[in-house]
């Protein structure tokens, strides 16, 4: 499926898009996250590690070098937020400064729009870390998918977004090394981010249709 998306790092456009998104009933959201330290800074700490004779400093340097987008929110930087309102339409916000990041975080915790997150534990820990709040209304599509698949075998119960939506969107995964601050404006990263949000929206719609079919079936046999 072809994805239509726009991106911005302009605070005025961010505010305009937020106003538009606030009129939707349902949106699908996804953060991209990178280490707080750039590759250049990590290289500098790697050099310090080689030269250091202090064990405490060595431990500190190793911790910095090992950080990535999956690390604790205190050790990471939010780089993108993608928000989709259909299976193929999305905005990608490049979180280039605190003004943009804070405006979007405020929207996420204040809006009454239903938010869809795939593996919400990952994204919501960042929202809570920065705001001390959670979104008012949200659905974790990964947990929902797990309930539908309901199989003890992990091989038959893969609820990763890429596995669930590969037939619709193809293989859009990118290498782990791409999740860094240097790639905030990379076209592949922007498309990846947009696809994540659109795929989450499409997955939710598919499960809603299946849920209605189940309810209709139960009504017919009752």
Tell what function each PLM region has.
Residues 1-163, 167:
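Conserved RNase H-like, two-metal-ion catalytic cores of nucleic-acid enzymes
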Residues 115, 175-176, 211:
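Secondary-structure transition/capping residues
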Residues 135-138, 179-222:
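Mixed-charge, glycine-rich, non-catalytic linkers/tails in nucleic-acid processing enzymes
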Residues 149, 169, 201-204:
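Generic helix-packing signal
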Residues 166-171, 195:
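All-alpha helical catalytic cores of prenyl diphosphate-utilizing isoprenoid enzymes
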Residues 169-180:
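Active-site-adjacent bridging/hinge elements
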